[in-house]
Amino acid sequence: MAPFRDLLLFAIATATCLAQSSGDGDAQKPLVSTDECKHPAYQTHILSKSPLVIYLEGFLTPEERAHLTEVTKDTFTHSAVADGGSEGLRKTRTSQSTNVPRDAAVRCIEERSLLFQGFDVPRTHLEPVQLVKYGQGEHYHFHTDWYTDAAAHARTSATGGNRLSSFFAYVAASDDITGGGTNFPMLEAPLDERWCKFIDCDEPWDRGVTFRPVVGNAVYWENLHPDGTGDERNLHAGLPVTSGWKIGMNIWTRQGPLGEDIRGPDV
C-alpha cells in the first residue's frame, strides 16, 4: 500500500504540473481518453496524506449525472448494512440505495476510477457502482467502508477480500438542500479558506471535516493500512439531510477480483 500511495501522489503532482505548464492552470488534464470515454478535466486537491484523502472537483460530467439518475429511477430500496459478507437492515442507515446497470456510461466512470488508482488495478476488483439517496431526516451513522468483523477475512477472501479504497461522489441534490454533508470526525480540518467551497468551515474544529454535497465532485480515500488491516481514521458518516434531498455514488475497490455473480454482466 505504501508504494502505491507514493506512486499515486507522484502521479497527481506530475499531472498537475503538466496541466499548468501547458497554459491551463485551472484544470488537471485527464490521464487518458479514448474514443468511447471522454474523461473530464477534473481537479485534485489533497486533503490528507495519512490517511490518504483526496478531493476530486468535477469528477462527474453533467451528462453522466443525468444518466445515472435516469437509469436508476424507481429502483431504490432501503439501504442495507454489509459487514463480513452479510447484509442487514439497521437503524444506523436510513437511506435508500440501488446498484447501477453497467452500461457504457457506467463503464467509463469505472475506467476513470481505475485510472486514478493506477494502471495495475483490474476492473474485476470493482464492486458494482451503487447510488444512495437521502431524503429529509435520512442519514448513515458513523462507519468504515472496510469490513470490521474479525471473522470476515476468511469469508471474504474468496470474494475479493476487503475494501481497499472508496470513492464517494455527489450525483444530484435539490436546490434547497441543507445538511447532508459527509463527516470524517478524525481528519484534521484544513486552514486554507479555499477549502470552504467544498467543506463546512462553520463546523467546530473538533468535529473533523464535513464535505458539502457539491454535485459533480467526489472524495477518494484509502481504507487499509499497508499491512492490510483497516484504518480507523477514515471513520465517516452521512449526516442527516435537514431539508431537500441528495443522491451520492459509491465506488469500492476490493483487494482481489470479484466474480460475475457479484459484479453482474455488462449491459
What is each of the regions a protein language model found here?
Residues 2-267:
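Fe(II)/2-oxoglutarate oxygenase catalytic core
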